[in-house]
């Protein structure tokens, strides 16, 4: 007969850190080159004009401008950046 009480172990009791995914810059917002537009797993959104994609599928602006979302049906949802007109210094 055992004189110690058997102590069970739990297979639960852990949690992962939050990943902070999602859209970071919405349609119409002004962005500068390098701004992160979307953090995602897989290609929920695809890069359009003036948008690059990192190796973790993060979309980021390649130029200064305004964010534009477009839905191309079966091809998917695309994010583009409309380049801002270059500022010309007045002499």
Swiss-Prot record:
Coiled coil: none annotated. The keyword Ribonucleoprotein applies. One of its GO terms (molecular function) is structural constituent of ribosome. InterPro entries: Ribosomal_bL27 (IPR001684), Ribosomal_bL27_CS (IPR018261). Residues 1-20 are annotated as: Disordered. The keyword Ion transport does not apply. PROSITE patterns: RIBOSOMAL_L27. It holds the Pfam family Ribosomal_L27. It comes from the Bacteria. Belongs to the bacterial ribosomal protein bL27 family. This is Large ribosomal subunit protein bL27. It comes from Deinococcus geothermalis (strain DSM 11300 / CIP 105573 / AG-3a). The gene is rpmA.
């Amino acid at each position: 007969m055992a004189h110690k009480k058997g102590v069970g172990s739990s297979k639960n009791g852990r949690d992962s850190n939050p990943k902070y995914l999602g859209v970071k810059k919405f349609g119409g917002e002004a962005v500068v080159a390098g701004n992160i537009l979307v953090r995602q797993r897989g290609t929920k959104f695809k890069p359009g004009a003036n948008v690059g994609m990192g190796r973790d599928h993060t979309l980021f602006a390649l130029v200064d401008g305004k964010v534009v979302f477009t839905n191309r049906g079966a091809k998917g949802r695309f994010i583009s950046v409309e380049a801002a007109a270059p500022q010309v210094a007045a002499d």
